[in-house]
Regions:
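Flexible, glycine-rich beta-alpha linker
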Residues: 1-14, 32
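A conserved pocket-lining segment of Rossmann-fold NAD(P)-dependent short-chain dehydrogenase/reductase
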Residues: 15-37
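Structural element of the ATP-grasp superfamily
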Residues: 17, 124-126
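Glycine-rich Rossmann NAD(P)(H)-binding loop
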Residues: 26-32, 60-67, 78-80, 112-113, ...
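A conserved structural motif in NAD(P)-dependent oxidoreductases
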Residues: 35-42, 138
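Short aromatic/basic micro-patch
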Residues: 36, 67, 119-120, 136
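Mid/C-terminal beta-alpha module of Rossmann-like enzyme folds, strongest
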Residues: 45-109, 122, 144-171
Length: 171
């Protein structure tokens, strides 16, 4: 499962959210458009392209056309998992994250990827697969669905005490 917010990944997002602490993000990204697709929709697109004569020798972007600013996406994370965000100066953000190995690529990821508006025209793949944009899971629904699944699958160690408490409560 991937949970991304600008250049941050799930390990940082969840650790901070569960601790009740904010994540720090670059102010420069707050109004930049991003496109994120739920993996289930991408797999449906793939399945409809395999052995599809209309897909031969073609290149496709497998994505939704739904897009939001990173600021809007941050609000989804707040609504779904309680994640708080503080927006700060970009150079200060990069200083906090570090720019030496293994993080030496963060500046480039931010400046040459995440700070560019990413709005996808998926009309070609929709036309070839016969799918409609309305069939896609919305970003907020996808994040919520995956967050709920993650919580169900999280392993917190042996959980012996929790199991004994559960057994006691069932008596």
């Amino acid at each position: 499962r991937r949970f991304q917010l600008v250049t941050l990944e799930a390990n940082t997002l969840f650790r901070r959210a569960f601790a009740g602490k904010p994540v720090i993000l670059p102010q420069a990204a707050v109004d930049v458009q991003g496109t994120m697709s739920w993996a289930g929709d991408v797999s449906r697109l793939m399945a409809k392209l395999v052995l599809n004569d209309g897909a031969r020798q073609e290149a496709f972007t497998l994505s939704t056309s739904e897009h939001h600013t990173w600021g809007e996406i941050a609000k989804y994370y707040e609504e779904i998992m309680g994640l708080k965000v503080e927006w700060i100066d970009t150079d200060a953000y990069l200083d906090i994250l570090g720019t030496s190995a293994p993080y030496s690529g963060l500046r480039y990821q931010l400046e040459y990827d995440r700070l560019f508006n990413r709005v996808v025209d998926n009309s070609k793949v929709l036309r070839v697969t016969g799918m409609k944009q309305e069939e896609f899971t919305t970003l907020k629904q996808g994040l919520s669905l995956e967050f709920d699944k993650l919580l169900e699958e999280l392993t917190w160690g042996s959980g012996d005490i929790a199991k004994r408490m559960e057994a006691f409560c069932r008596q």
